[in-house]
Amino acid sequence: YIVKDIEKLADTIREAFQIAQSGRKGPVLVDITKDVTAAKTYFESMEPAVIHPVCETIKEKSVKEAIEMIEAAKQPYVLLGGGCTLSDASEQVREFVKKIDAPVCDTLMGKGVFPGEDPAYTGMLGMHGTKTSNIGVSQSDLLIAIGTRFSDRVYGNAKTFASRAKIIQIDIDPAEVNKNILIDTAIIGDVKAVLTILNRRLSQQQHEAWMQEIQDMKAKYPMTYHQERLSGPGLIEKI
């Protein structure tokens, strides 16, 4: 948006906030000219903007494909992104992870959705991620990406990322599918709504050998720091 008339400023800001909070939430640019910022006008308060709910168009075919892939997997991995936070889907995520018995990694925007003290959690993925998460995803046969846009800091080299795995992407925005990483199937819809369906229809999975392999990897590659000098983690630990 660009606002050149002070009389249009209030309506434009209102519309921008409405768009920012509807569907896939995100920033909206409003460019206001200098003369408008210095101008004066009469403002009449309005009712709060209506936030449009997400139109649920979750396709049955996509759900069936995802369930078949999950139940056929031997070494699944779950990747959580910011969409899980925006959807307030922490409870559904925890139930899903328990149901499919898989390790979990996340992006920076997805941190806090899944409890960090849970044995299934392996830390962040990608450039700033843990060795366990990066190796684990590279060895997985199914990656379930939930509410993440696959930024380059997560996947690194697109040609070699999760090269052994089939990929399921769950996202509210169809424009994010196959944008950075080619996937095998996608479920378009709100994360909480999609996971609620999957949790209800999936059978309980067991991957004891795979989960033990991940635990061994976490023990082999722990998150450590130099204790002989002052560091952020050391200070937090002392506090």
Regions found by a protein language model. Give the residues of each.
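Structural signature of the thiamine diphosphate
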Residues: 1-46, 69, 134-168, 236-237
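Glycine-rich, anion-gripping cofactor-binding loops and their flanking helix/strand elements
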Residues: 84-168
